[in-house]
Amino acid sequence: RLPERVRSTVTSALGLFTLAIGVRLFLQTKNPLIALGSLALGGLLGEWWQVEQRLTGVGARLEARFARGGEVEGAGGRFVRGFLTATLLFEVGPMTILGSIQDGLTGDYSLLAIKSTLDGFAALALASAFGMGVMFSTVGVLAYQGGLTLIAGQAQAVLSEAMMAEMTAVGGVLLIGLAIGSLLELRPIRTGNLLPALVMAPVLVWVVAQVAVLLQ
């Protein structure tokens, strides 16, 4: 186990890097209002469905079953924080979406391989800070990536370049929230409840396109 000051520095470095990546990805948006609308609607749905609370509940149940000794700190402990932070960090990234779609559409998994390498380094840093919970996040990540790959195989004619751009931008904002709320700990942000915004982004792109056609 790394010393506390080392864990703090490594986690802060990961937070700053995540923040920078999030800003860069958001700047890829073609229409910031769509990203804003996606986040607003996604946040409403996330609060209604209690996405983050459910993720926390899963982490708490795993903690009660598997954590030992000093790692048991209740629902707000290191195990749950590690599970939630790693799940969000590894799933929210647009590289997950793009890589899974690329794999599903063309069979090329090179982008997912690159992402897995990056996730491995991030997991080492997170595990030293948050403990055993990081390991259990891999189950959700594998299911999420596999599901996206399967869906992508059927969605070739659905996701346009504009839809992918806005999904990437929204993912960037979620990475910023993750960096601020979980890694840098500047203020609490229920980033998990914003995950539905990733689905709302292509929906809003389609709606705006249809409205534009009607107004012509």
Question: PLM features: what roles do these ranges have?
Answer:
Residues L33, G37, G104-T117, L159-L174, ...:
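Structural signature of hydrophobic alpha-helical transmembrane segments
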Residues L204-Q216:
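Juxtamembrane boundary at the C-terminal end of a transmembrane helix
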Residues R5, G181-M200:
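Interfacial loop-to-transmembrane junctions
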Residues G76-Q156:
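Helix-loop-helix junctions within the multi-pass membrane cores of secondary transporters/permeases
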Residues R1-R7, D103-Y109, F130-M132, L186-I189:
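Juxtamembrane helix-boundary/capping and inter-helix hinge elements in multi-pass membrane proteins
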Residues L2-A60, A64:
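Membrane helix-loop-helix hairpins that form the core translocation module of multi-pass transporters
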Residues E4-R5, V51-G82, V213-Q216:
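Intrinsically disordered, low-complexity non-transmembrane regions of multi-pass membrane transporters
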Residues T11, G15-L16, A20, I34, ...:
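Alpha-helical transmembrane segments in multi-pass membrane proteins
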